[in-house]
Curated annotation (Swiss-Prot):
Summary of the function given for this chain in its UniProt record: PPIases accelerate the folding of proteins. It catalyzes the cis-trans isomerization of proline imidic peptide bonds in oligopeptides. Seems to be involved in root development.
Family as reported in the entry's similarity comment: Belongs to the cyclophilin-type PPIase family.
One annotated GO molecular function: peptidyl-prolyl cis-trans isomerase activity
Organism: Arabidopsis thaliana (Mouse-ear cress)
Activity regulation as described: Binds cyclosporin A (CsA). CsA mediates some of its effects via an inhibitory action on PPIase.
Summary of subunit composition and partner proteins: Interacts with the PP2A A subunit PP2AA1/RCN1.
Gene label: CYP20-1
Tissue: Ubiquitous, mostly in aerial organs. Higher levels in leaf and buds, and lower levels in seedlings.
Record's catalysed reaction(s): [protein]-peptidylproline (omega=180) = [protein]-peptidylproline (omega=0)
Name listed for the protein in its UniProt record: Peptidyl-prolyl cis-trans isomerase CYP20-1
Amino acid sequence: MASSVTLLLWSLLLLGTLSAIQAKKSKENLKEITHKVYFDVEIDGKAAGRIVMGLFGKTVPKTVENFRALCTGEKGIGKNGKALHYKGSSFHRIIPSFMLQGGDFTHGNGMGGESIYGEKFADENFKLKHTGPGFLSMANAGQDTNGSQFFITTVTTSWLDGRHVVFGKVVTGMDVVYKVEAEGNQSGTPKSKVVIVDSGELPL
C-alpha cells in the first residue's frame, strides 16, 4: 500500500514537472525571434548608435510583417503619398521611466502614420506582455487602430497589457534607447530632435 502511494506521488511530481517545463517552453516559443531589424539613431544631428530589435513573427506574424517592411521601405509609396519607411522619421514622444514613441512618417507629430495594409489594421492578439524594458509594442488610438506608430518600453508597463500588441524586443542597443530616453520629459516633447537616420533588416 505504502509503495503504491509513493509511486503515485512520484508520478504526480513527474507530471507536474513536465507540465511546468512544457508551460515554460510554450512561453519561450511565443518570444521566438523570426526577424531582426535595426534603427540607426541621431540625437541633435549627432550619431547616437544602433538599436537592433528581434521580432516575434510566430506569435504576431501580421504585426511583425508590417514593422519589418516599414524598416526596409520595400513597399514603396503609401496612400498618403509618403514612403512607407521609418528612415528619416523621428521619435516624437519620449517620456522618461516609461517609453519612447515613433513611427509617424507622414506627420511627424503623432497624428499620422500608415501601415502596409492601408491606414489602420486590427489588433492581432495580446499573447505577449510588457514585462520589462526594451519591449516593442504598437501605439494606437484605441481598439484596432494600428498603423505604423510604435513604442519601446524603458520599464515594465503591465497596465498596457491587453491594450497594445507586443511584437518584439531590443536585442542590442539598450544603451541607445536610454540615451534617447534622456532626451524626454513628462510632457513627452523631446528636448532635442531624435531621428531614425537609417533602418533595415539584418540576417538572424
